[in-house]
């Protein structure tokens, strides 16, 4: 027996060392691929980053947004960590028979706990199998790779239980309360005898070891690379405002192109995202583009970028992405690595011509322009991947380097550049919306200065509030409420320009920066300290992105200011409205800035209002379809996003659909028309509803467009 044990131990060391070598090689290979990306500065906010690890890795916060899948993963995650101690104990039993972890009197409790955890993991395996292959969740893939990990995990659990059962027979330990499942197995298979039990034990032991080491090698070259890349991605995730876009330095004369035209144009943190992807499909499941039949799928976009990075990385670094290399010699990645290294067959050498276009061959332009930048994908991602900034970088390359843009979007860009608004209306008519509110005091900054008066807030009206007839009524309602509450404010009037959100989200960074610099100059010239706006897109820009260009000031959304005025008693809702209202969360107000409560607090304060929530509300709320510059583009594929969102609102039978965004209100208003429900269901901004309740009949609400 001693000779067998020596041979067994030597073989164990050789096989384990080889598996560990392959694992280290694969991790270093993926790191080499990631390093092809653009370097970036790391802010070293270690404490906050460790807190993110604690909350999202160990706390599984984002995973638990989907309770069923989240609980399965929690069982896998903690179960797999805990059973590793049992695996060590099992390996010791194979290397030194009748030995175990030196836990003394605690050992029986340890084995009992291990068996319970092992049993729970087997339940989780069965549950996961059911969800994927029987319930057939649309967002989950059902290929061989998807099932392989269930085989690995299930095999690991079954072999350790079988091995422990045989160990009881082999060493005549007898049945034990501390190993209930192993004891059942020993009872059922007791007829095999000591020798038979020893043989079966070592078969189970080696199968368990091979499963474990195969899984170790499989992890870095599969979707389970997220076990390594996921925590790293959470740690290195941006600590600043969600969805904030990177500034392009146009003064850098060494740049030959802008945006991402090649995979290596992405930042290294963006490339880390690709290997962190869990392939859970939650992003795609929530995407408004995917849900309405568009070509874009956030998960598929990440996976195709990942596969392209792997192949490009193999060609550039000569490191084979798939090992053992002999088993994967026909894969494209390994052929590219062999060709790059100057070795391999003629077939491999031909693969060196690998040079697909990132935009066109890997990701289509149709996908790039389908994104509404709503960030529902990012909000759902359990490993904190960022999809939107990659799409914007692809748009930047198309617009700034290749000069490509949708014709309708280009028309809006030209109008913004020439007249400061997407319609191309006369810039000198920007303040004319005040004419419809002769009974309200809406001074310009110039008029206030002329009278020697000061103002607390600069009211940024925005292009929608200034030119769109329906949105002008929101601006008027808000202005009258500020007047009623005694809040001093002023507008820039004809000096106001477009905020730049549309150009930036459509990829025209140059125009955005030009507008931002001019707007900031105007703010500084007029000593602006506080800005309030009815436009969530401008709100997000001023609050989170303008500071990159030197802006310093407080920024508020109009619902934040109104909620505070109601709370302080300066605005008193007193007239009953008798409406059943459902509130639509603007993406740039909600997911980008987590402003969910103020508009709801306002609606709840209005007498006679019953507030009912849509199934998808707050952080899971669906986009109206206007974001990302799509307000100015036609939807040519699938169903209209605004109609889909309107259907969700109509499903709860409201009399009013409310919002805190002029873009959303326009899209939802069009949606009620498309569903022929405009006579039964009205669309109003929160400010309009509050004005009606505070001011009563003296305040005529805006009619539906």
Task: Spell out what each predicted region is.
Residues 2-127, 134, 265-274, 296-300, ...:
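Iron-sulfur-cluster electron-transfer modules
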Residues 14-21, 122, 154-158, 199-235:
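Alpha-helical membrane-embedded segments
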Residues 22-40, 93-96, 128-147, 162-177, ...:
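Juxtamembrane/interface segments at transmembrane-helix termini
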Residues 74-85, 149-171:
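Hydrophobic alpha-helical membrane-insertion segments
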Residues 94-109, 166-200:
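Membrane-interfacial helical/loop segments at transmembrane boundaries in membrane proteins
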Residues 243-299:
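Non-transmembrane accessory domains of multi-pass membrane transporters/channels
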Residues 277-283, 287, 301, 371-377, ...:
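Short cysteine clusters
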Residues 461-557, 588-605, 609-705:
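Cofactor-cradling patches in redox/metallo enzymes
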